[in-house]
């Protein structure tokens, strides 16, 4: 008789607990920092820097394998990908900052 009661309590507890996802960890970077880097990467793109060279520049900025560097790689992939086709230096920064602030 105790086993069904335990199962019932477990189900009630699970149903009452809210499930939510945490935003992607930023490490020591703020959303302003993410936006500033997006603008910097977009400037590189507008200056004709190829993606491979931009990765080399990122390695010089952040030689360690950190959460910050992973985030910066994601930003660079967006900037040098299809999204970057319609961005300016300013809009890249503001878009990435807004996305960061909304937890994306």
Feature roles, as predicted:
Residues 14-18:
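N-terminal signal peptide c-region/cleavage motif recognized by signal peptidases
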Residues 45, 49-104:
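Compact alpha-helical subdomains of small soluble proteins
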Residues 32, 40-41:
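Hydrophobic alpha-helical segments
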Residues 8-9, 19:
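Cleavable N-terminal signal peptides
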Residues 1-8:
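Bacterial N-terminal signal peptides that target proteins for export
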């Amino acid at each position: 008789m105790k086993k069904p009661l335990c199962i019932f309590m477990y189900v009630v507890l699970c149903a009452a607990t809210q499930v939510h996802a945490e935003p992607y960890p930023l490490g020591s970077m703020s959303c302003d920092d993410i936006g500033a880097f997006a603008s910097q990467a977009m400037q590189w793109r507008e200056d004709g820097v190829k993606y491979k060279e931009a990765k080399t520049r990122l390695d010089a900025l952040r030689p360690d394998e950190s959460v910050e560097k992973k985030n910066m790689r994601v930003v660079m992939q967006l900037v040098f990908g299809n999204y970057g086709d319609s961005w300016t230096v300013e809009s890249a920064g503001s878009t990435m900052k807004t996305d960061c602030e909304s937890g994306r």
